[in-house]
């Protein structure tokens, strides 16, 4: 059809502007099929990293390309993805599927729900209050049977065809606290994995001396190494130094309570965000906590800005973020900076409730004195460990 021409008319005056792109009408036979090659593919609401993230697409997902903008591709279910994260599949059939069944099975620490499909279709998930909802796009149900045995996580499953090409599965859960999930394709079978609660959150008795016995906790000391010092105080002390000191103290306190603690770093070394995230994915801890200290831009109000902040992304991490924030503010008599939903690398892992704690502002002169005080650092570590302990007790 060619290049579009836009015209605006007002008060008998017309302004014309030629578009920067072309408009084409493609035959359905000419539509391209994109297959996700990244693990996972980052789906967004628009054609830029400025747009919000949607549920990541498992490697192998296929969808029809319905638009392009620069280095971005629009998929038929509504999301955009960078062209570098997909490959165009030649002579592929339209990415549509029939689903006839589903079944569950238990593996070590997880319940897997298998959805046999004809092609790997796009998916989204949503965590609710005692519910986990999975939506399959470009899918039509011809379902006769679903096997779902008694399970540590799932109490019941309901499903419905919510539109001609969308099937939605709602898992009713036995606990309000969710512990993590994973999505992958085995061939054309979608595998949804839901993590079981830590053994220590069951009704089994726990040793008062070791209340976190059997629980794996990942502690991330923010920043590190010569390339990433983090925030710098007025006297030159770097955030990376304090986060490591406090993280090691937290590790000691958690171990004393029986926890199995995994540290992303124990020395002043460079460690980019992707390896930290990969460690969470590999270790599959019960929870992950990233330790940081805050700062402001050069024009920020350093004198009047201070306090403890907590950040979460997935709903499963909200309870932990809120509990730790409130506990530290009350226990240590610290000001509150607030609790925030935030799309951060260290809050995005879905395999475990993952939070990032900003424990104070290094640029605030008064708070800085508290931050670097060894006695206060010890009290802070004890409060974090005790807060974690009491949170686990609260979600039984």
Q: What kind of feature is each model-predicted range?
A:
Residues 55-58, 240-248, 252-256, 278, ...:
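Solvent-exposed, polar/charged alpha-helical surfaces in well-ordered, non-transmembrane soluble domains
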Residues 285-291, 303-335, 339, 370:
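C-terminal structured domain segments across diverse proteins
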Residues 283, 287-290, 294-298, 309-312, ...:
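Active-site-adjacent mobile loop/cap segments within catalytic or ligand-binding domains
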Residues 1-217, 256, 293:
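Short linear recognition/processing motifs and adjacent strand/loop elements at protein termini
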Residues 196-279, 283-285, 297-300, 304-306:
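Active-site histidine-acidic residue metal-binding/catalytic motifs
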Residues 47, 51, 237-248, 267-274, ...:
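Soluble non-cytosolic domains of exported or imported proteins
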Residues 223-226, 237, 267-271, 293-298, ...:
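Solvent-exposed loop/turn segments at secondary-structure junctions
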């Amino acid at each position: 059809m060619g290049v579009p021409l836009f015209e605006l008319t007002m008060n008998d005056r017309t302004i014309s502007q030629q578009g920067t792109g072309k408009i084409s009408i493609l035959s359905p036979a000419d539509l391209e099929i994109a297959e996700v090659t990244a693990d996972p593919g980052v789906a967004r609401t628009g054609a830029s990293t400025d747009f919000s993230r949607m549920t990541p697409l498992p490697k192998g997902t296929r969808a029809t390309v319905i638009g392009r903008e620069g280095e971005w591709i629009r998929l038929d279910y509504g999301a955009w993805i960078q062209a570098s994260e997909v490959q165009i599949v030649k002579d592929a059939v339209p990415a549509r599927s029939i689903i006839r069944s589903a079944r569950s099975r238990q593996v070590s620490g997880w319940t897997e729900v298998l959805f046999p499909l004809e092609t790997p279709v796009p998916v989204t998930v949503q965590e609710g209050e005692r519910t986990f909802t999975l939506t399959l796009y470009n899918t039509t149900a011809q379902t006769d049977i679903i096997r779902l045995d008694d399970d540590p996580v799932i109490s019941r499953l309901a499903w419905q065809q919510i539109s001609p090409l969308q099937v939605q599965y709602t898992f009713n859960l036995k606990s309000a606290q969710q512990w993590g999930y994973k999505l992958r394709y085995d061939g054309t079978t979608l595998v949804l994995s839901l993590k079981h609660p830590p053994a220590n959150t069951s009704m089994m008795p726990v040793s008062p001396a070791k209340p976190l016995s059997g629980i794996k906790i990942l502690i991330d000391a923010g920043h590190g190494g010569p390339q990433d010092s983090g925030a710098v105080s007025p006297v030159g002390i770097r955030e990376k130094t304090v986060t490591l000191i406090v993280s090691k103290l937290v590790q000691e306190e958690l171990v004393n309570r029986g926890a199995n603690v995994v540290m992303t770093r124990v020395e002043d070394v460079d460690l980019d965000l992707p390896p930290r995230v990969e460690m969470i994915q590999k270790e599959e801890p019960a929870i992950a906590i990233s330790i940081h200290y805050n700062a402001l831009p050069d024009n920020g109000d350093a004198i009047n800005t201070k306090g403890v902040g907590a950040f979460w992304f997935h709903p499963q991490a909200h309870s932990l973020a809120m509990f730790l924030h409130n506990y530290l503010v009350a226990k240590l008599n610290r000001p509150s900076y607030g609790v925030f939903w935030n799309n951060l690398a260290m809050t995005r892992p879905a395999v475990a409730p993952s939070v990032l704690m900003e424990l104070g502002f290094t640029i605030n002169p008064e708070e800085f004195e508290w931050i670097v005080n060894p006695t206060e650092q010890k009290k802070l570590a004890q409060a974090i460990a005790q807060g974690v302990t009491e949170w686990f007790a609260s979600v039984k």
